[in-house]
Amino acid sequence: MLVSAAEMLKKAKAGHYAVGQFNINNMEWTKAALLTAEECKSPIILGVSEGAGKYMCGFKTVADMVKAMMEELNITVPVALHLDHGTYDGCYKCIKAGFSSIMFDGSHYPIEENVEKTKELAGVCKGLRLSLEAEVGSIGGEEDGVVGMGECADPKECKMIADLGVDMLAAGIGNIHGKYPENWGGLRFDVLDDIQKLTGEMPLVLHGGTGIPADMIKKAIDLGVSKINVNTECQLSFAEATRKYIEAGKDNEGKGYDPRKLLKPGFDAICDTIKEKMELFGSVGKAFE
């Protein structure tokens, strides 16, 4: 059974750890994430971008697949199925499809319109007991064709959005999607601290978790980050393991071309990456606390 992310993030906030959101892109990704969470006894948030949802034949297909896999694999840890960087229309599609959590990315709207739409969605989600994530200040890099410059959020605007009844808040603090450039200036902990002071107990979300040094991750958690998103790192791990398999000629050995064998190294690499992140975030063993 899927659950809202609200309760798991409240526990993470109180326990000074973070829950990982690991984006899924197909069956292998989903299975790897679920099995690793169960092995680690960690709560998990499965993220689905609108592009990934379209690739997997629609949000209902994704929701039905996740629910069926949880039942078949006997998954007992808390699992939230979360729309990542959702448009206004996309949020309603995911609500209808059976997602348990959504993110409305209104960061590209003027703050007044962001407030209006977020407030509306907060009311809808509260009535359905779904969790809602909002964003202030665009996250750098590219996500499904939307390019953000990575500016820092205004703490006062964060307070404005947090007071609308959302369950978690993503705020730009110099983080970006994808690989970080060599000249990246690092996370703005001063901005994060100001945001935390104004938003109180609100769980904060760190997007672009790939490539951020471990010490920065731990400091961000200390300053109130309770959810960390990881996508690119799993993709890179999958690609590298698959490349090695093919370059070693394994696909030409016996029935090594069978997709179930061909995709296995990449699957294992995703599992290893997720486990490594759960250990870093401190969520291992926290599923039933």
Give the residues covered by each predicted segment.
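Active-site proximal loops enriched in glycine and acidic residues that flank catalytic Cys/His/Asp
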Residues: 173, 208-210, 232
